[in-house]
Structures are given as C-alpha cells and as structure tokens.
Amino acid sequence: MLTFMELAGPTEGDGGGSVDSQLWAACAGSMSSVPPVGAAVYYFPQGHAEQASAAVDLSSARVPPLVPCRVVAVRFMADAESDEVFAKIRLVPLRPGDAVVDVGEAAAAEARREEENSRPRPTSFAKTLTQSDANNGGGFSVPRFCAETIFPELDYSSEPPVQSVCAKDVHGVEWTFRHIYRGTPRRHLLTTGWSPFVNKKQLTAGDSIVFMRDEGGNIHVGLRRAKRGFCSIGGDDESLSSIPGWDQYRGLMRRNATATATGGRTPPKGKVPPENVLTAATRATTGQPFEVLYYPRASTPEFCVRAAAVRTAMAVQWCPGMRFKMAFETEDSSRISWFMGTVAGVQASDPVRWPQSPWRLLQVTWDEPELLQNVKRVCPWLVELVSSMPNLHLPSFSPPRKKPRNPPYAELPLEGQIFTGPVFPPNPMAHDHHHHHGFPFLPFPDSSAQPAGIQGARHAQFASPFPEFHIGNLQPNLMLYAGIRLPPADRAAPAPRPPRIIISTDLTIGSPGKPDDAACSPSSGGKKIDDTKPRGFLLFGQAILTEEQIKNGNSDGRPASPNWDAEKAPNTSEGSDSGVTQGSPTKNTTPSWSLPYFGGNNISRASEYELNPGQCKVFVESETVGRSLDLSALSSFEELYACLSDMFSIGSDELRSHLVYRSPAGEVKHAGDEPFCAFVKSARKLRILTDAGSDNLGD
C-alpha cells in the first residue's frame, strides 16, 4: 500500500507543504469532501477534464467513462500565490475481480470521522469582502459573531477596547492585526496590519476571508477566491442585482454550473494543466497508479466519487418529471440551502465521446431559475429524489388518478399510463480494457458491441422505452388486449419482420401481413393488394415517404404514393380520444392501426373499441386517456354518479350537469336524457366537461 511518504517530495505545482486538514476544510467549504485513504471511488475523466485550464483531447487514449479505483494517498495543499486550497489524490485502478468496496483503512477513517463529529468542531467564519473591506488603506469590518467567538475576548472596560490578533495563513505565515471596537454605532474593526495583508494577498471585492479557531485556541486565516465572470450569461451581474437575495446566492452555481453553448460540454475554466489530465486518464486506462489535483472551489463537482454513492444513485430509473432537491452553499458558506427541481431529460452530456457516462446525466429545471440559471445538468448522486412520479397537469376540479390495476400482461402498459421515457433499465457494459469492470448501473447500452453502421444512429436507442414492443413479437391475445386485431396466423401471408411500433401521437403504421378480411378494398372492386408495393407511413395526416419510394417515383416525376390516400380517407365514425385507429381503406389500401391511448383518428363503436356490450370509456375533457367502466353492473343514474364520483373525486351534483355522451346516431346528449336501460345500450364514450355549457367530446 502506498503511503504519504511516497508523495513527500513536492512536485511541480505543489505550491509547498501540506495544509492543516481543518483549515483546508474550512477554506474548501462545508459541501466539499475528499475520499479517505482506502476508499473505493469511481474516477470520471470527463469531470477531471472540466477542471483543466484548456481543452483536453482524450480521443486518442480510448478513455472509458469511469474507472474504479482505490484511494491510496491524500495530501491537502494550497497554492503558493493565491492561497487557494486543493488536494492531491493518488489512485490505483482496481484489477478485474476486485470488489469495488472500501477497505479497512477507509472504514477506520469513517470511524475517526464519526468520532471527530461527536467532538466540538473548530469554530470558523467566512465573510465576503465588500469594496470597503478590500480598499487599500482601509480597514476590515468584523462581524460580531466572528469577533466574539473566534477572536480573543476584548476588554470592554478600556476606552476604546483594543487588542492585537495573531493569525496564521495556510502556509504557516503569521499575520498581526489590530482589533478595535469603535464608531457610531460601535462595531469591530481590523485596522493596523490589514492593508499589508490585502496588498500581499491581492484581495478584491467578492473574495472571501475565513477565520478559524482550533482546539488549542490558535487563530488561522484562509481565503476563497471569487469566480469572476461566471454567474452571468454573456455579461456582468448587474442585470441580476434586482433579484432579492442575489448577492447572498451569487455563488450558488459555483460547483455545478454548465454551459449550453458548447453542446452540453462544460468549457474549461479550471487550473489543472491539460497535460496532467491526459496523463492521469491514460494511466487510469492502462491500469497504472496516477495522481489527480482536485480544486474544491472550482466550478465542477468532485470527479472522484465514492463508489457506493454512484451505485445508489444509478439504481434509480431516472425519467423526466421526477422531482428532486439539491443542496447548495452560499459563496461565503454561511449556510446551505436546498433547491427544488424537476428532471427534464435523461441523456449523456457528451453522447459522442462518452455515450455511456452517467456524468451530468440529468437535464434539470428549477423552481427558482433566477438563482440557478446556469445549472442545466447535474450528476445523479448530487441530488436527493423527492418524488419518482412525474407531475400530472389535471383540471382544477379533477384530483390525481386512482392507483391503476396491474394489467394481465406485463408486456403492455397500464391502462391510462403515459410513456414518459426514456427509462433506462440496468445495462451491463463490457469494455476491452483489462481493468474495466462490468457496470450494471450504466444508463445506456454499450455501443462498442454494435456494428459500425449502427453506432452512427445511437438516437434510435431513445425511440421507445420498450425496445421489445414489436407487433411480430406479441401474441394475438396480447394485441387484442391492446385493442389491435391481428389476422390468424394460418391466414396471414409470410412477411418480413414488421417495423417497430413507435409510440407517437397520430402515427399510423402499415400492416405487416395480408389479412383476408381486409385484402380487398371496397372501392377497388375486390382487387388484391399488391404485395410488392412498399409500405407507407402517415404522420399527423401527412404521407411520409421512404427512400425506396422516392427512388421509385412515378413517371410524371411525383414520388410513388403510399398504400392509402391520407387526404381522402374519412373517419369511419365520430372520433374518440382513446381507441384504435383503423384507417378507412380507399383505392389500393392496406389495413393500418395505431396504438391505443395515444390519439389518432379513433372510432367509438364497441366492436372497434373491443368493448363488450354495456362497457364504455370515461374521459375528462382535457384528457386523452380514458378509463373503462362497466355500465351493465349499474342499475341507475344515481349509481353511475356515485361510481364516477369515487373514480374522479367529483361531487355527484356537479356530475349531473357535466356528464355527456354520444348516441349511435351521433347526437350529443346529457346523462339522464333517456332511460337508463337505453343509455347502457347506446353509451360507449362518456366525457366529464370542465364547462357545463360545452358539448365538446374532443372530436
């Protein structure tokens, strides 16, 4: 096992000796953490490159998205010129078969940390310098808390109360300040000795100064440099000065901000030489020990993350709509605030270079976007899940839906369930590097095993969160449950593998076979359909031509038309917001269908709905997904109103004036206009209107 002695000799960029760990932690901030020796971590080269001072080209090294490593040494240091603290971490990649878990040293470190947490922590205080504090020749206004808890106690009996305060910086240099209590109203000030300190450290307004008192009563002083030109978008922060609390939260975006102008890649803004990043990534790829420099005050999260935290975060099947909260600290680390957000997307931040990387996997939106306007992407292990259910935007009088029942077939979605994908199941990744482990938590399938021609079409991975949902793969009874009628297998002519059903509103897909009951068009005089003609696609009422159809154009220069006329095909009945789309065949047509519950030119007849007599669908006016209701089990309108009241939590009196249906003749009626027995026979689609004066059934 490597020890600190192997790192004793300072190397280029070290900036001198080690820094007291407590002072280092006070300067780094309460949210910064460094894994202890012996801890199992995942090293993210993508995150390491974000701390580089220039762009890093890692394409030649074939660097994986993450490398399992063990921490063998940690050294806390500070820059010789700026006093900015950083850590040098030595890592050893784990070999195949090694468990990615902490070893005894890390467990002992955790025990020591718990013991230290039980003891009183050293008192520290940070203040962001104002223009007056940073003025050359001026003084420093000491907050009362700092003066009374960190500085030695003043003798208030003297006039004025005054004393000398000695503090050591991160390099061990001692500074002496004159502490006086004066003014109207009276306040604590550092006068003599402050100006030389400002000049030596080159302090400016926006920088923060940290005072800490250790257990022995010694006072230490450290610095936090402001991140200039960072919080604003294409300008200064003056445009945001009117936002309440902006000065306090000016640094909230420091550790997690991303730029969108570079296609999701965070532009380099760190202090690590790019050659150091390339060397570390290359050695990690080849399984050799390597060192990294970590700046806790940089604009990016930690890139050496505890393995347990990554596994826990990636065990969640993230999808858009999930609610989460995330902790941020103010620039002076005076407090930590939690901000609520919503997952807007789940996609690799750099799908070309690292298509499988979970680094900054989540695209997010915030409830308070003014304060977090640059935080567009976050890592899953930095957020805390609040709700795994996406937000449902329902009418004001309509409550959330009741808990759905499990369908009889696992291959199909729940009735009324909306596909919010992409939802990524665990996918193991096999990598050719000898040290690379299988990562069951990686969010995307491994593209290295795909043919070269498929790798260029990775976007097809996101077409549907159910990749096995093929017409040809489902049994006829499963398709009947979905509302799609297929011909018997013994009557269907052999056909190539049908295209995948893409879940999209108003998307109609050509038939893969030739069912006898639809092989002859009514308007074509019984002529058989030409099998050789390519299938056509109808999207939002417009014909979508394939490349083959464009090449095989008509003699007059027009492309060959699809197998049906989109503009002339009428609906077979009055529309419905839920059901199977059965395009009316015209000349040279093939039967077509679309998935239920996703709109389209729908029909309301019981046979087309695949509903038994006495059954119907119930909709709320603003919804496109209906719920099944068995009217034959009811005996009166009162029971109907009571059932719907329990189903939607709407008062029975309100339902009497808001419930309408369409008769077989196409007439819109209110419930109660005809006897209940006649209503049961004719009603196939009920709709609860948000406006009692509306007769809109959504057709």
UniProtKB/Swiss-Prot annotation:
GO terms for cellular component: nucleus. SUPFAM superfamilies: DNA-binding pseudobarrel domain. It is found in: Nucleus. One of its GO terms (molecular function) is DNA binding. GO terms for biological process: auxin-activated signaling pathway; regulation of DNA-templated transcription. Expressed in roots, culms, leaves and young panicles. Residues 110-119 have a biased composition (Basic and acidic residues). Residues 613-693 form the PB1 domain. Residues 125-135, 570-593 have a biased composition (Polar residues). Residues 108-136, 505-533, 551-595 are annotated as: Disordered. InterPro entries: ARF_dom, ARF_plant, B3_DNA-bd, DNA-bd_pseudobarrel_sf, PB1-like. CDD domains: B3_DNA (cd10017). Residues 125-227 bind DNA. Signal peptide: none annotated. Keywords: Auxin signaling pathway, DNA-binding, Nucleus, Transcription, Transcription regulation. Belongs to the ARF family. Interactions between auxin response factors (ARFs) and Aux/IAA proteins occur through their C-terminal dimerization domains III and IV. Auxin response factors (ARFs) are transcriptional factors that bind specifically to the DNA sequence 5'-TGTCTC-3' found in the auxin-responsive promoter elements (AuxREs). Homodimers and heterodimers. PANTHER family: AUXIN RESPONSE FACTOR 10 (PTHR31384:SF86), AUXIN RESPONSE FACTOR 4-RELATED (PTHR31384). This is Auxin response factor 10. The gene is ARF10.
